[in-house]
Amino acid sequence: MIRENFSIGTEIKEIVIADLVLILAFTLTLEGGIGGISMPYSFVRRFFYLLPIVALGVTLSFVLHELMHKFVAEHYGAIAAFRVSTMGLLITFATGLFGFLLGIPGATIIYTSYFTKKQNGIVSIAGPLTNFTIFAIFLALLLLLRPAPSSYTYALISFTIFISILLAFFNMLPVPPLDGSKVLGWNKSVYIATMAVIFVLMFLFTGIPISSIVFMIFIALLFSLFYRNLM
């Protein structure tokens, strides 16, 4: 179970642990998991090439997403804290080892008994909108700096664009406990408009195939099952 301990020191430690495990698992996923170790030198060289790229994108997209949930919830008078899930950390790392990622290291837990549907929806949409903001900033940087496609700068910026809009889309899927289910429960028009913009941007700037969309939906359903088993 996710523990109820509101020490700020504990919260910082747990979000750092979750971020590090997610970075490691995502990097392993991009390497194809442990299957890539068949060529050790190439695996290690590529791993350390990818690590800073993944660290920037994941840290901005994941940590800021969770913190925004916390800050908006606290604005409405709730108690909110990020908490890791030990089982979630293990699943995140293990799936990364096998070359696909179920990233569920933890979440911002909100403790309140008086949230309206609107407040819950606004708290929930704050995370994906943060991802959208990161996407917009880094897209502007890409257009402004125009780095060579073969450069490390291009890799850093383009991956952050990719992961930020990807996380926005995943979290807006209408599957409990993902943000999208709460936004949809609050306001269908807001949900449809937000999801439509994210969906179009994702296809325009990431080139994600339909098969990957289907896979993300499958992962969301697995996440939902895992969440229900925790409750």
Locate the predicted segments by residue.
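Hydrophobic transmembrane alpha-helices and their immediate loop junctions
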Residues: 1-231
